[in-house]
Amino acid sequence: MVDKTSIQEAVKTALSKAPERKFKESVDITVNLRNIDMSQPKNRIDETIHLPNGFDNVKIAVLGKGDIVTQAKEVNVDLIIGPEEIERLGGEPREARKVAGEYRFFLAETAMMPLVGRYLGVRLGPRGRMPMPVPQGMDIRPIVQRLRSSVKIRTKDKKVFHTKVGTSGMEPEQIAENIDAVLHRVESVLESGTMNIHSVYVKTTMGPAVRVI
């Protein structure tokens, strides 16, 4: 696999070629795979990857009541959904779709999972965002902190995936470290590792793509 220095140079080029904006753009990578049959579920990637350098806009929702809600408030979780709200959202498909699209990670009390599956499964499932079950008594605070520095990779049946790896306000070295973390994790779950990766591109939201591999 490509070394961190080469990744960092590609990131620097992508940042330098990006049009000047008054806001922080996302920095994303596109990874194209090869020599792998994605029609076979065992070959598909579905991974949550912790990044060494997080960014501040990963939204997390917690579904439940009682102690899990208290903990969620302590770590400023972006959205808390109680059992009544779960049922209400089940009857509001447009609002439920918005929630499924806006929040990246979901945590839910294990006891709530049947309710979530019944009312929100059709919205969350296809996006790969069914909640992580949380047993009663588990401390969710460290989990939330870790997820805030994580990305979700999900290929379904396609030989390509895209993921955010930083923002234009981060140092190139930090973004390169995040890209390296993603690629190493993906290599570890691919049948032939590096040989299954055809190409990798990095770009800002509005900038041109720069080839890494």
Swiss-Prot record:
Cell wall biogenesis/degradation in keyword set: no
Molecular function as annotated in GO: rRNA binding; structural constituent of ribosome; tRNA binding
HAMAP family in alphabetical order: Ribosomal_uL1_A (MF_01318_A)
Subunit structure: Part of the 50S ribosomal subunit.
Gene: rpl1
Disulfide bridge positions per record: none
GO BP annotations, alphabetical order: regulation of translation; translation
InterPro entries per record: Ribosomal_uL1 (IPR002143), Ribosomal_uL1-like (IPR023674), Ribosomal_uL1/biogenesis (IPR028364), Ribosomal_uL1_3-a/b-sand (IPR016095), Ribosomal_uL1_arc (IPR023669)
Keywords from the UniProt entry: Repressor, Ribonucleoprotein, Ribosomal protein, RNA-binding, rRNA-binding, Translation regulation, tRNA-binding
Species of the source: Methanoculleus marisnigri (strain ATCC 35101 / DSM 1498 / JR1)
Highest taxon, organism lineage: Archaea
Protein name as catalogued: Large ribosomal subunit protein uL1
Gene3D superfamilies attached to this UniProt entry: 3.30.190.20, 3.40.50.790
Pfam families according to UniProt: Ribosomal_L1
Cellular component aspect of the GO annotation: large ribosomal subunit
UniProt record similarity statement: Belongs to the universal ribosomal protein uL1 family.
Function description: Binds directly to 23S rRNA. Probably involved in E site tRNA release. Protein L1 is also a translational repressor protein, it controls the translation of its operon by binding to its mRNA.
